[in-house]
Amino acid sequence: MKIADLDIQPIMLYLPDTPYWVNRWRDGKKHFVESGITDLIEVAGVYGEGFGIDGTHEYNLDNPTGHHKIGVGYTAGFLSMYVMYNVANVLPNSHFMFLEDDTRFNDGWLEKLNLELQNVPKDFDFLFVGSCCAGGKPNTHIGGDIYRFDAPYYPMGGNCYIVAKKALPHIILTQRDAYAPADINLCLHTFPELKVYAILPRLVEQNNNILPK
């Protein structure tokens, strides 16, 4: 898929395991096609309950004595994204757009993305197309609706973002402990060495969920 002269491959994460997840998969594909995405690669993720996954590592950043574990769903989500990054890393494209099945594009998103990709620096590693929790965090305005974020303050969320292939080996190397949800894990262990940007306001929403700005 050519967007602003970049060779961007859309990749969708889905689960084929229960009627609930199959319906989300079907509805997501339908929306993506209607939104102008026709060359989608679909990657089956890790279904935590079906795989018998139970994360044992603790996430204690917010409460050092809490002995908190993120649970089956977040652990499986982390592992699913790790699979996606490895799939992308062997494909020939220069950039990848990672999508969740409940991603919903705003009207005019593709035209806006074409415009904003001309504002983001050509050597970017990671671009949030959709995000949450960016409001109030320090950033640097680059141009148009493009903002750069630096450690330790980053947007959150994983419903739509573009990654340059050159960044994938670093992501794969640094995402090796499923103790924290995937987006938090990126902020803590991966983003400090990457050039991270966001389009604000975001171009996508999450189906049936109002995300904080």
Predicted regions and their residues:
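An acidic/histidine-cluster motif and surrounding catalytic segment
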Residues: M1-L99, T103-K213
